[in-house]
Every structure is written in structure tokens, then in C-alpha cells.
Amino acid sequence: MKTIHVAASRSYDILIERGILTRAGEEIKKVCGAGEALIVSEDTVWPLYGETVLCSMQDAGFDVTSFTFPHGEQSKNLSVYAEILNALAARHISRKGLIVALGGGVTGDMAGFAAATYLRGIRFVQIPTTLLSQVDSSVGGKTAVDLPAGKNLVGAFCQPSLVLCDPHVLSTLPDPIFYDGCAEVIKAAMLKSHTFFEDLDKTSPREQLEHILEFCIAMKRDVVEEDEFDTGARQMLNLGHTFGHAVEAASNFSISHGCAVSIGMVMMTRAAVKKGYCKEDVLEQLIALLKKYHLPTEVPYPASELLDIVRSDKKTMGSTVTLIVPEKIGRCTLVPIQAVDVLDWLTAGGAE
């Protein structure tokens, strides 16, 4: 078992091991004790792993029940969030209680935000079941729900008590969902390591899962420890997200998060080339790797359709939008621009 420790405002461990789901109750009990708990999951994940985690927690002495909701970004809203709160209240979960998030990024966001706000905060544990959530969204304590105006506009920072990553569960993922998570993996390489980028180019991701998980989680851990509340260095993790979130929202979330981030990274890198921040070969190598991982690289919407969404993004501060701009593979820089210049960057990124 690989353990990665996160020294945040609430320190916790991320445990990586094949088959750890069967011992979930035992591992959670070590950290949280065995008390009352609610497992929050999505309807596609629960039939696969719900009973395993539920029985494991019952065997460890937990008084545990479950709540499931329809999968997909469309469920990441205030209505479903309220349903989770009502489920907690109906089960009389106290401040000593626990929420377990079993699922992908949407589940982690929803369960985490409920944990942050129910009774002004209770503990929660992340059991991510997608590549995207294992390498990214389950690490760092960001929780949120969407509004019609955009993604993640209502949320809180809430560090988990424990994260359990089981690489075995990724074997059940259909290729589109698996490769969707690879966008965040490639993002990590673009941010921090040319060598890791080359590893991704040479070897199939399914053949190096543990290596991918350990690199991406450790990279994000380092950034979170430096800037837990996203005021400086952590903004780097938004590479591809400023424009990507706009693409995702413009599609009414029919374009998945990873695919949107892939498009967003290409847009930002193309703009960086045109504005002299990096060389053309950086863009060429990025596009080639994304295509190898079956990820989209073309901008599906005009700049006019994306503009207002970018300006209302949660990363916009007043009249300033901070862009994460590649300089080379393994290094990016923060570039603050005025909101009036967003259209120019969108156009430079390939949005007509």
C-alpha cells in the first residue's frame, strides 16, 4: 500500500492499494472510529461497489445507510444537494457522524459540500471510483455545486478525513470515461514534468496506473500544501479549466469535464504560441498526446458564445481574469489579463 500524506488545515492520508475497497470499513474506523455514517453514491456506481463498501463498514461496526442520486453533472445542483442534507437529517446524523463519498467527481463535490455545511461541518471520507476523481478532484478539499450561470459557483473548502484510492475499480471504467480522466493526467504533466509527459506518450495509461496515481496525487498534494485556499500557486491547477469550463457550460454539460479540459488546454496553448509565451512544438506535442488518448482538440463553439461564461467564472476577480499559460512542457505561468481582453485570448485560442 502506498500512503501519501497531505499536511493541510486538516491533515489526512491518501491510501493507494488494489482491493482496498474490501477493507474500507477497517481503514475508515482507524481514522474516524465506528459511528453513524451515510454513504453518498451515484446510481451507476452503487450497483458495482455499494454493497462491498456498505458491508465492509457494517462489519467494522458502523451504523451506516446510503443515499444515491442520478449520475452526471446535471445532478450537481442545489436541489440534489438539499436532498443529501435532508437524508442526513432524516437519519439523525449528528456532528460526530460521517459522510462517505463513493463515486466520481460529482459525488465527491456533492458529498463534500454537504459535509462542509450540514450542522456547520461533519467529517467525510472520499472513495473516488474514476480516474479523474482519483488523480484530481478527491485531493485538496474543494467542494461545490453548479448554478445555471456556471460551474462550481457555490462551494466550500472541506478537507476529507481520509481518501481511499483503489486502482482496481478503474478496470471497470468504459474507455470514454477512463480517457476523460486522462485529461487531468496530461494537465499534470504539462504543469510539472516533461519526463512524465514522455512516460504518458510511451506507455498505455492502463499499464501504468499506480505510477500515474502516485505522480498526480503527489503533485497536487505539494500544490495544496503550498496554497490550500487557491490564492496563489494552486491557481496553476486550473490549466485548461478557464476556457474548458466555458466549453462545458456552453454544451449544457453534454461535453464531459475531461474533454472540456482537453479543449481548454489546446486553446490556451494555441493562444500562448500566438502571443509568444511558448513555441509551436509545445502545441504540436500536446495535441498529438491528447489525440492518442482519444481526447478532443477542436473548439466547438464561437468566442461570442464562450465570452460571458468566462467572465462569470469563479476564477474571475473583479475586472481581472488570471490565465494559466504554458511556457513549455512541464512549466506554466500565471498571466493576469483584463476582462476586456478575454475575447482576444479566446480568438487566439481558436474560437472563431
Give the residues covered by each predicted segment:
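Short glycine/serine/threonine-rich phosphate/pyrophosphate-binding segments
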Residues: 106-113, 134-135, 246
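Active-site segments that bind and position negatively charged phosphate/pyrophosphate groups
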Residues: 198-304
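C-terminal charged capping/lid subdomain of soluble metabolic enzymes
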Residues: 183-185, 277-352
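Generic secondary-structure signature for well-ordered alpha-helical cores
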Residues: 93, 159-163, 168-169, 175, ...
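Solvent-exposed alpha-helices and their adjacent loops that cap or buttress functional pockets
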Residues: 31, 92-94, 117-118, 146-147, ...
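A glycine/threonine-rich phosphate-anchoring loop and its flanking beta-alpha core
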Residues: 15, 113-202
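ATP/NTP phosphate-donor binding region
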Residues: 1-97
